[in-house]
Design a protein with these regions (language model features):
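Alpha-helical adaptor scaffolds
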Residues: 16, 21-94, 98-101
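Terminal, low-structured helical/coil segments at or just beyond the last alpha-helical repeat
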Residues: 110-137
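A positional/architectural concept
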Residues: 1, 8-9, 16-19
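Post-transcriptional modification and biogenesis factors for structured RNAs
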Residues: 104
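Solenoid-repeat scaffolds in large eukaryotic assemblies
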Residues: 4-8, 41, 78, 111
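Inward-facing hydrophobic residues that define packing positions of alpha-helical scaffold repeats
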Residues: 5-8, 12, 45, 82-83, ...
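Contiguous, function-dense segments enriched for cysteine-driven chemistry
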Residues: 54, 108-110
Length: 137
């Protein structure tokens, strides 16, 4: 495992600030999550955001980072990470995750507003998910 992490670090260094570096870091984070090593996944995702020069990749990494932080009970950090989601294509997913985090924090009104925003901007499946979450409040 340490050898693979060293190879990833070497690759990222060789491909600094490129999409290749972001993709390998996203893949590394996925592996850590599969092993339930959320702290390492968080580090990989933070590196991916730092390496990214693209709003879509930054948004994807920030969504995943927020989910990992949420998993670890870092609710404020998870909400802060969602502020890095800039791509409009991810706005409903951002709002759905924000609502889940707000519920965990006990902020039902904030969650309601987030789910209502997701209903406005989401695709049909996201809108249905937002409605289901609103019904459960």
């Amino acid at each position: 495992a340490a050898e693979q992490q060293a190879k990833v670090a070497e690759f990222v260094k060789a491909h600094d600030k490129t999409s290749y570096a972001v993709f390998i870091l996203l893949d590394e984070a996925k592996g850590f999550v599969a092993k339930q090593d959320y702290a390492s996944a968080e580090n990989s995702l933070k590196q991916a955001i730092a390496q990214s020069q693209d709003d879509i990749l930054t948004s994807l990494a920030a969504l995943r980072l927020s989910a990992v932080q949420f998993q670890q009970g870092q609710f404020d950090a998870a909400l802060a990470s969602l502020n890095q989601v800039k791509s409009q294509g991810f706005s409903a997913r951002k709002d759905l995750l924000a609502g889940d985090i707000q519920i965990a924090k006990g902020d039902v009104n904030g969650a309601k507003a987030s789910f209502e925003n997701a209903q406005k901007s989401g695709n049909p499946l996201e809108k249905q998910m937002a409605q289901m979450k609103l019904n459960n409040l």
